[in-house]
């Protein structure tokens, strides 16, 4: 396809290996250093992109305190080849933060407010725990269900409403690990993982070019033996069917169609449409349904037009109802999360939006797809979606 001057194109994508938050490979690496390394290496492998042209570094991060505080986007940017004259901002839409970073850059490009952006995100959940420094307002319970901030219970609710069984969830969790392991063995992650130094379980410094979160030894019997993680009496959501708590970062170079043509760059994809939507916080995991429907309508497409889908696997109990109501549950094995998802790879909050978007682009490239959807639920009841077209 030919590009229009204000089209938003993805030039390249990279991510760190996903590390376990408890004693994992990134345990001695700070979030800013992880981010700076990733940005620097991605720019290094895209020599046609002059760092001086970067308008803004837009970085997703949820818990913006400790090493992730004081505008981590700027902290990381200052340690890269990007000059001090370029700007940087940190954004949060909880789980959808780095996809929001992508949308912010896209909107700037579409309106002529910049041509070259670096976007992505990071979350070091081992150094800055999920609830560190968080003080929820008790008055919220007057406006939303008391458990709306407890993601596992919202997944339990959504699964119950849609009749999702424990066995269905266990099968979905097993699938995630099997597909992620298969992708690793077959080298499918090679283009997206940017190697990093880290520490192995014995404390030795080594270069990691693989995700240490994947458990190829996972069995259906093992998953079935796990106790409910959030509702001990009658719950069906377990640690094995929930996204892992992990550390990681992801990064994209985004630019206008005009600048890509001027530089002679063949982009990975162009953004066809974007959308966000809200749902009741008590069923926060349902957000991808309205946001995807909205994005498809804006692009003049239907779900039948979409070749591949990346849906963030916050919980199996959440992902399955979304796929059911998007009418792709029966096409899951052909179209959805073909390299596994967050159950196997983890969900470092600020990282995940750009991570699933980049993984989608690699799946499309490797399998010859043209149109793809990246979508995710967002804590407290939101959904965010991006529709991509490969060029």
UniProtKB/Swiss-Prot annotation:
Gene3D superfamilies the record matches: 3.40.47.10
Catalytic residues (positions): 95, 347, 377
Alphabetic keyword roster: Acyltransferase, Cytoplasm, Fatty acid metabolism, Lipid degradation, Lipid metabolism, Transferase
Cellular localisation: Cytoplasm
A single GO BP: fatty acid beta-oxidation
Enzyme Commission number: 2.3.1.16
GO terms assigned for molecular function: acetyl-CoA C-acyltransferase activity
Annotated catalysed reactions: an acyl-CoA + acetyl-CoA = a 3-oxoacyl-CoA + CoA
InterPro entries linked: FadA, Thiolase, Thiolase-like, Thiolase-like_sf_Thiolase, Thiolase_acyl_enz_int_AS, Thiolase_C, Thiolase_CS, Thiolase_N
UniProt pathway: Lipid metabolism; fatty acid beta-oxidation
Top-level EC class as recorded in UniProt: transferase
Gene Ontology CC annotations of this record: cytoplasm
Cited function: Catalyzes the final step of fatty acid oxidation in which acetyl-CoA is released and the CoA ester of a fatty acid two carbons shorter is formed.
Summary of subunit composition and partner proteins: Heterotetramer of two alpha chains (FadB) and two beta chains (FadA).
Membership in a protein family: Belongs to the thiolase-like superfamily. Thiolase family.
Protein name as it appears in the record: 3-ketoacyl-CoA thiolase
Species of the source: Pseudomonas putida (strain ATCC 47054 / DSM 6125 / CFBP 8728 / NCIMB 11950 / KT2440)
